[in-house]
Amino acid sequence: MKLNEIKDNEGSTHSRKRLGRGIGSGSGKTGGRGVKGQKSRSGVAINGFEGGQMPIYRRLPKRGFNNIFASDFVVVSLARIQAAIDAGKLDAKATVDAAALKAAGVIRRAKDGVRVLADGELKAKITIVVAGASKPAVEKIEKAGGSVTLLSAPAAAE
């Protein structure tokens, strides 16, 4: 067997059924939709309509709400910061903040600020100024000889 001799198993592929292409095709005129009625018309079926049965979105209760004041932080791991330092995109000697992370391509935009999580290892000694950091992340940064400064929420928004 050669690469140019490989083909699908017999009967595993079917040609597309072309609807509404004349009476001789066997599926012309109404194209398998029957005669008249809502389901024979063009356009898709009504979303969420279950044939008169009470639809699922009305059977289940409403739950929760969206807090318009919730802070939306961009999450950055220590591994991503270390990778940016190793690649020369981030200067470990300078203060690492949201603007520096954005310039390095680690984050796209700051939203309500940056939150650092402890995924991965940090070898570089960095001074980081962010809106939030997990306790393990702070411990790892301080263990590497760096420091963490947490911003208040309004100052974090840029």
UniProtKB/Swiss-Prot annotation:
Residues 21-35 have a biased composition (Gly residues). Residues 1-13 have a biased composition (Basic and acidic residues). Signal peptide: none annotated. Keywords: Ribonucleoprotein, Ribosomal protein, RNA-binding, rRNA-binding. Belongs to the universal ribosomal protein uL15 family. The gene is rplO. Binds to the 23S rRNA. GO terms for cellular component: cytosolic large ribosomal subunit. The keyword Acetylation does not apply. It comes from the Bacteria. Transmembrane segments: none annotated. This is Large ribosomal subunit protein uL15. GO terms for molecular function: rRNA binding; structural constituent of ribosome. Residues 1-45 are annotated as: Disordered. Part of the 50S ribosomal subunit. GO terms for biological process: translation. Gene3D superfamilies: 3.100.10.10. InterPro entries: Ribosomal_uL15, Ribosomal_uL15/eL18, Ribosomal_uL15/eL18_sf, Ribosomal_uL15_bac-type, Ribosomal_uL15_CS.
